[in-house]
């Protein structure tokens, strides 16, 4: 039997779990693990410049691949710096395992140097936290951590490791468990047959049905089953911000994103529907607006693997607890047996109404402006990448422009902080994606506010040769804050103008990368093409685009209104 120290057990456990990359930053409490990483080998470690970025990188990897991202940080400030990244992953149900160092067990509770209660601090934003107290427990705890992170509704798991249990002088037998189970945790994956049959019958009988798809559909990997179901029943589809890509955006039945900045046709279809078939969604406030006015005539069918998400905000008339992929497979089997296809004549009038809403062309903008419109930047990017890039974003107007003007036809291509809305997410997430998928085109869409939250990771990108394209929509404002101030606060721009911005091109060059400035509309196509060519030649390129600072994101739902109440421009509302 192999004899290993606690630190060596950590590394061997990661290897036995199939982990290839770890993102982290060393410190006193985890130096034994870092020494084991060096001596044992087998794992690529990415040395970040800030622990928050380490978590975002692991998060980006997890979103793009479906694998569990792994982070290693030291105790005290190393652990607390990771919290924002952990909370970001928690809100979006992303599987992570975060290994945090801790002071020796004999010092816990005595305010030792770099001590903090990581289990207590992280508890509200993790799926589970472990404090490992004995060296021999390390393999079993890590096996449980990965299983918890990836199963059911995924999420981050923290494993807190006191320094003394990692002692390289203390060797114990290493046994990697073949399987793991937890008596109090057994997520339901197969849907109830009776409920599925009721849901299908309700869908077939509907006159104004709509399918509402969220991030849970991407997690479940049900895009093919979803497409087959939707096409068989001729159903219109809307997606949440997190669900973009679960159903092809260029498909004729796709109506785009719904919610606060959703398309006119998506929001109107939701509001007027008589049946809503919700797949892997939370019905969060950014998609419902005023619950008292929400979809007043709709029967709600809701599939979700997390029973606590069903009827939490919107009551489900037919709840189905289970994995979305398995439930849709069950539904397709039932559909084939009963041949219960939606007669086209039954919802022809509904589709005619939807096409009238679609004809409103809610995403049109001024294409002849002398200033660069942010919408044009995203559309050009989509065209030049043939819609096949992995796109990460930060948070703000640029995030909404990317969501609306870059149609995603594949899952896991759109990577953003939807729930927590974390500025500074985009760049490190892009680096995590590129680390996992080196042959793919990876683009970070950001803004002059967000990019400065984690811009130090340009150094990490250089060290590990991670050629991504960074597109900075520079409007010299905190754009979304300014938009709200324009619309709600009578144009009082309190602390939303970004003074003393750096020269981003020269800053990128100082970090060892290529910087490109775009200031005029006629430069957009050629310089973005040049940037993508440089990326293909293994260079990170930072493109600073001077965009129209007065531009707003539309549509925008009216605060306190129903799904059908929107601003379509600065002067037009429904």
UniProtKB/Swiss-Prot annotation:
Name the pathway. Answer: Amino-acid biosynthesis; L-isoleucine biosynthesis; L-isoleucine from 2-oxobutanoate: step 1/4; Amino-acid biosynthesis; L-valine biosynthesis; L-valine from pyruvate: step 1/4
Q: Does the keyword Flavoprotein belong to this entry?
A: yes
UniProt-annotated binding residues for Mg(2+):
448, 475
Q: Which Pfam families match?
A: TPP_enzyme_C, TPP_enzyme_M, TPP_enzyme_N
User: Which cofactors does the annotated protein need, by name?
Assistant: Mg(2+); thiamine diphosphate
Q: Where does thiamine diphosphate bind?
A: 51
Annotated FAD binding sites = 153, 261-282, 304-323
List the molecular function annotations (GO) for this entry: acetolactate synthase activity; flavin adenine dinucleotide binding; magnesium ion binding; thiamine pyrophosphate binding
Cofactor binding note: Binds 1 Mg(2+) ion per subunit.
GO annotation, cellular component aspect = acetolactate synthase complex; cytosol
SUPFAM superfamilies for this protein: DHS-like NAD/FAD-binding domain (SSF52467), Thiamin diphosphate-binding fold (THDP-binding) (SSF52518)
- Give the record's GO biological process terms: branched-chain amino acid biosynthetic process; isoleucine biosynthetic process; L-valine biosynthetic process
EC number(s): the record gives 2.2.1.6
Spans annotated as Thiamine pyrophosphate binding: 397-477
For this UniProt record, give its keywords in alphabetical order, as a comma-separated list: Amino-acid biosynthesis, Branched-chain amino acid biosynthesis, FAD, Flavoprotein, Magnesium, Metal-binding, Thiamine pyrophosphate, Transferase
Activity regulation summary: Sensitive to valine inhibition.
Against InterPro entries, the record matches this protein to: Acetolactate_synth_lsu (IPR012846), AHAS_TPP (IPR039368), DHS-like_NAD/FAD-binding_dom (IPR029035), THDP-binding (IPR029061), Thiamin_PyroP_enz_cen_dom (IPR012000), Thiamin_PyroP_enz_TPP-bd_dom (IPR012001), TPP-bd_CS (IPR000399), TPP_enz (IPR045229)
| Catalytic activity annotation | 2 pyruvate + H(+) = (2S)-2-acetolactate + CO2
Which family is this sequence assigned to? Answer: Belongs to the TPP enzyme family.
Assembly information from the UniProt record = Dimer of large and small chains.
The record makes one more remark, namely: E.coli contains genes for 3 AHAS isozymes: ilvBN, ilvGM and ilvIH. Contains 1 molecule of FAD per monomer. The role of this cofactor is not clear considering that the reaction does not involve redox chemistry.
Q: Quote the protein name from its UniProt record.
A: Acetolactate synthase isozyme 3 large subunit
Species this chain originates from: Escherichia coli (strain K12)
